[in-house]
From Swiss-Prot:
Family membership noted in the UniProt record: Belongs to the GrpE family.
Gene: grpE
Basic and acidic residues composition-biased segments: 43-53, 216-225
Source organism (scientific name): Prochlorococcus marinus (strain MIT 9301)
Keywords in alphabetical order: Chaperone, Cytoplasm, Stress response
Name of the protein this chain belongs to: Protein GrpE
Pfam family, one: GrpE
Length: 239
């Protein structure tokens, strides 16, 4: 009986001891849990920060790549647009050139008729009333023909007094001139024409060689002596 009481007393002491230590153990566990939570939260934040940095870095790289692709596409567009514009202009020029070639071929065949009218106007001097009436009729046709050429973009060249240009003129004759300097056109032998600013037919012209060379006194005396020698030689042969 006494032993049982003693055991009960011991058990109570143990319970009291356990109860006394329980708050300390509980507090220690709470502190440990808090520390673990803080470490876990810190690690999570570090992981999230690293992931965010990686995401930003990847986005920056992707943005840089897209900017390069955009610049490449932009340059391609500019080149294609320029090529198309050049192609369109070239096509327009080719069509204009073809049109001018076709028109010029036809007009070139008409120009000799115009030349004949102009020569007739310069050479013919009708005297009778009937001849004058016929002449006026021909000149009326000539004016109509010139007007048609004008409507097609044909314009005559005015070359007399102009400096010779092989791109516009063809020199048929060259002769000295006191009036015109060297390489200036003295006379128009056949009229030249433009078509839309381009040469339809070159003008045939007589070109100045400049003032004729005047002999010096020595050259005149030399020619006189040579003439006398030739005369003496001829006289000797006759004898």
């Amino acid at each position: 009986m006494i032993e049982n009481q003693s055991d009960n007393i011991d058990n109570k002491e143990i319970d009291v001891s356990i109860q006394d230590n329980a708050p300390e153990d509980k507090s220690s566990m709470q502190n440990s849990t808090t520390e673990n939570d803080e470490l876990s939260s810190q690690k999570t934040e570090e992981i999230n920060t690293e992931e965010l940095k990686n995401t930003i870095s990847n986005n920056d790289a992707r943005l840089e790549q897209l900017e390069k692709e955009h610049e490449t596409l932009k340059n391609q567009y500019v080149r294609i647009s320029a090529d198309f514009d050049n192609f369109r202009k070239r096509q327009s020029r080719d069509q204009d050139d073809l049109k001018i070639q076709l028109v010029s071929k036809t007009l070139t065949a008409i120009l000799p008729i115009v030349d004949n009218f102009e020569r007739a106007r310069q050479q013919l001097k009708p005297e009778s009333e009937e001849a004058q009436a016929l002449h006026r009729s021909y000149q009326g046709l000539y004016k109509q023909l010139v007007e048609v050429l004008k409507q097609q973009g044909v314009s005559p060249m005015r070359v007399v007094g102009q400096q010779f240009d092989p791109n516009l003129h063809e020199a048929v004759l060259r002769e000295p001139s006191e009036e015109f300097e060297e390489d200036f056109i003295i006379e128009e032998l056949q009229r030249g024409y433009h078509l839309e600013g381009k040469v339809l037919r070159h003008a045939l012209a007589k070109v100045s060689m400049g003032p004729g060379k005047q002999k010096s006194q020595q050259e005149v005396e030399k020619d006189t002596v040579e003439g006398d020698v030739d005369s003496d030689a001829n006289t000797s042969e006759d004898v």
